[in-house]
Regions:
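N-terminal Rossmann NAD(P)H-binding glycine-rich loop of SDR-like oxidoreductase domains
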Residues: 3-23
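Glycine-rich Rossmann NAD(P)(H)-binding loop
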Residues: 6-7, 156, 180-185, 211-218, ...
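NAD(P)H-binding glycine-rich loop region in Rossmannoid oxidoreductase-like domains
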Residues: 9, 34-86, 90, 96-99
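Conserved glycine-rich Rossmann-like NAD(P)H-binding loop of the short-chain dehydrogenase/reductase
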Residues: 26-32
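Conserved Rossmann-fold NAD(P)-dependent oxidoreductase catalytic core, especially the SDR/UDP-sugar
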Residues: 78-133, 147
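Conserved beta-loop-beta element that borders a ligand/cofactor-binding pocket
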Residues: 92, 135-158
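Alpha-helical substrate-binding/gating segment
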Residues: 168-178, 185-225
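Mid/C-terminal beta-alpha module of Rossmann-like enzyme folds, strongest
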Residues: 201-266, 271, 290-291, 300-324
Length: 324
């Protein structure tokens, strides 16, 4: 197949391009080229998507499939104007769902209101879900055939967000760790490599429809046990963490993956079975954590989110002082 990856230089889109090359496809990546190189074996066509598509994008012939991770509607419109006859795999997000307490998926979960015009996400990060809703609709309306995948939390080596790196750094730890909130709270992640492989499979099979791209949900305690089976985990209640100034999900004073409950009961508890039935294969959490730890050790520039180990030790000390 001849596959066009819109992007191809960072995290997920780069993993998609690399997997497609490994599987023997002809891969073209369209990107400004400012965020890194394309994988070996792929061809780069430079395209700033704030402008119309360059002639070089389509000059080499038709594409069998297009993979797009865009978040701005104008970028999707420009691509569809010249590429609508290919099979599209559009990578959206579970952030399109309006109710984070509800795990309902495609066809059942209520969507956010579409935002059809571009928004600077640095100024308004809350617009992300609505922008993706608009992008989904553009693709489904204009492409000859298409599948929309809605990933949850994408993790693994190369993650620029630093969220799962917090836990990957703890892979194999044997000391005491903070477990945030309720250990029975459901969480789910998907390894970027598994997602990329599945996206290429969807392109090969010309799968259509809309699917949540998530791994199986599991209790938070099980996730931590997979990451650090020999560690002692002390679970600290939400109220205590909030009183200590610890934020959920992301940021320097956060514990990543932890979310307020019940407001976010559904966000990391979507049904993985439809994706598994459609060919998604997921590796174990322990493998993802180990590989993330190894990547952190090999890349000094890798981002690690969340509180420091020193802050974690302070939390444990404060907790013991409160309960003794």
């Amino acid at each position: 197949m001849r596959i066009l990856v819109l992007g191809g230089t960072q995290f997920l889109s780069r993993a998609v391009a690399a997997d497609a090359v490994r599987r023997g496809h002809e891969v073209v990546c369209a990107s400004r080229g400012h965020s890194g190189g394309v994988p070996p074996g792929a061809t780069l066509v430079r395209w700033d998507r704030d402008e119309d598509a360059p002639a070089a994008l389509t000059g080499g012939g038709a594409y069998d499939a297009v993979v797009d991770v865009a978040r701005q509607p104008s970028h999707v419109r420009r691509a569809l104007a010249v590429l609508a006859d290919a099979h599209w795999v559009f990578v959206s997000t579970i952030s399109v769902y309006a109710d984070d307490a509800d795990p309902a998926g495609p066809g059942a979960g209520r969507l956010r209101e579409a935002i059809p015009d571009d928004v600077d996400l640095a100024e308004d990060p809350g617009a992300y879900g609505g922008l993706k809703v608009a992008c989904e609709r553009l693709v489904l309306d204009a492409a000859d055939s298409a599948v929309v995948v809605r990933p949850g939390l994408i993790v693994g080596p190369g993650d620029p967000s630093g969220r799962f790196a917090y836990w990957g750094r703890r892979a194999g730890d044997t000391g005491e760790l903070v477990g945030p909130g309720d250990p029975s709270s459901l969480v789910q992640v998907i390894d970027v490599r598994d997602l990329a492989t599945w996206i290429v499979t969807l392109a090969e099979r010309r799968t259509t429809g809309t699917l949540d791209a998530v791994g199986p949900a599991l209790p938070f305690a099980d996730l931590v046990r997979e990451i650090a089976p020999d560690a002692t985990v002390t679970w600290l209640p939400d109220a205590f963490l909030e009183a200590e100034g610890i934020a959920p999900w992301t940021g320097p004073d956060s514990i990543p993956v932890w979310l307020p409950r019940p407001a976010y009961d559904g966000m990391l508890a979507h049904d993985a079975q439809p994706a598994l039935d459609a060919g998604l294969v997921v590796r174990g959490i322990a493998e993802t954590a180990r590989d993330t730890r190894d990547w952190l050790g090999s890349d000094p520039a890798a981002r690690i989110g969340g509180i420091t180990r020193e802050r974690e030790a302070d939390l444990l000390a404060h907790w013991r002082n409160r309960t003794t």
